[in-house]
């Protein structure tokens, strides 16, 4: 009887300890990225996110980063999470618009939201819930993980002044913005960051846009093209994403799930500040040391771009793709609301500062 009682007691004790023991188990996740190793802002942001999760969890969840091409090709990063080759990826949702065009809205939209507006939509105006619906189909979960702010319009071998100058232009530009440029006559393609310079150098591209001065300086585009158009009207605010395997994420204890969420939020803010601080410094270097010409798109191109953007958005909103349609409707409703704030705060303030405040 004593032996039987001891056995029963041991079983109860083991059951009691099992849940805490599991919650303390150490795991390692693999994060694949679309960014080159040590890439300013975005690639470093992925590394920082991995470090945050590892540190905040006390090592219970450690994340090992594989930069573009180290484990899978950069534009197969999401597929690696879907098929289980990695637990996590870091990139931009509009790279996957072939899976659902609605995903483009979670990166940035031509003539759409600024960075703060976009974050407001995703976090407080229903965007995250729709994003979850789209990614549910693939067994993954997406989180905002960084933001570049308003991007540069691109690098061009020759100056472009009219819409006619765009006809047949071989241009690297992804997402809905790529569709806009295609409507304006460009021949559009998408390439990963590390592939763009070679394409420009080989002459297979006439123009390329990626992010802005901070990243573009590192990629060396100025060595091939000197005409740098700013700002972008197709990427007024561009967010990056961290994607996790939904089954792996849900298997985590509640505190580790919250650590992943909080780490993504913290790194989103960190990347945004990093980009704002270093873009102007990099631009000065491009101009002063490398002879880059900073140009603005003509009103003709801006107006044609706006019209084409409206056509692209209308096409998504009127499509048979229910989730893409739902995404577009939610985005446009949020943009309409958020413009009422911008119209009486940010926009007039920036005009007034530029016009009247000359203090240095």
Annotate each PLM feature.
Residues 1-4:
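Bacterial Sec-dependent N-terminal signal peptides
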Residues 6-14, 23-118, 130-360:
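N-terminal secretory/targeting leader peptides
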Residues 18-20:
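N-terminal signal peptide c-region/cleavage motif recognized by signal peptidases
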Residues 126-127:
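Basic, amphipathic alpha-helical recognition segments used for DNA target recognition
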């Amino acid at each position: 009887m004593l032996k039987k009682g001891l056995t029963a007691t041991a079983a109860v004790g083991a059951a009691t300890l099992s849940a805490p023991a599991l919650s303390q188990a150490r795991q390692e996740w693999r994060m694949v990225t679309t960014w080159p190793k040590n890439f300013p802002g975005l690639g470093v942001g992925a590394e920082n996110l991995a470090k945050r999760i590892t540190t905040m969890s006390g090592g219970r969840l450690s994340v090992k980063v594989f930069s573009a091409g180290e484990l899978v090709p950069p534009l197969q990063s999401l597929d690696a999470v879907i098929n289980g080759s990695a637990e996590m990826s870091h990139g931009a949702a509009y790279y996957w618009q072939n899976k659902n065009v609605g995903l483009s809205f979670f990166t940035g939209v031509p003539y759409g939201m600024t960075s703060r507006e976009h974050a407001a939509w995703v976090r407080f105006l229903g965007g995250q819930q729709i994003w979850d619906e789209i990614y549910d189909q693939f067994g993954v979960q997406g989180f905002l993980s960084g933001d570049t702010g308003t991007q540069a319009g691109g690098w061009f071998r020759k100056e472009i002044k009219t819409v006619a100058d765009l006809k047949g232009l071989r241009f690297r530009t992804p997402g809905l913005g790529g569709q806009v440029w295609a409507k304006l006559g460009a021949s559009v393609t998408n390439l990963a960051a590390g592939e763009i310079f070679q394409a420009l150098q080989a002459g297979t591209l006439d123009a390329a846009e990626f992010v802005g001065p901070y990243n573009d300086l590192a990629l060396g585009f100025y060595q091939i093209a000197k005409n740098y158009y700013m700002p972008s009207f197709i990427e007024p605010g561009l967010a990056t994403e961290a994607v996790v395997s939904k089954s792996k994420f849900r298997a985590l204890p509640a505190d580790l799930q919250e650590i992943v969420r909080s780490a993504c939020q913290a790194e989103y803010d960190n990347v945004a500040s990093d980009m704002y601080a270093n873009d102007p410094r990099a631009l000065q270097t491009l101009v002063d040391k490398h002879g880059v010409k900073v140009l603005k798109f003509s009103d003709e191109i801006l107006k044609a771009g706006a019209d084409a953007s409206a056509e692209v958005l209308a096409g998504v909103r009127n499509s048979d793709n229910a989730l893409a349609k739902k995404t577009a409707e939610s985005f446009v409703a949020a943009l309409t609301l958020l413009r009422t704030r911008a119209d009486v705060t940010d926009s007039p303030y920036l005009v007034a500062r530029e016009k009247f405040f000359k203090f240095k």
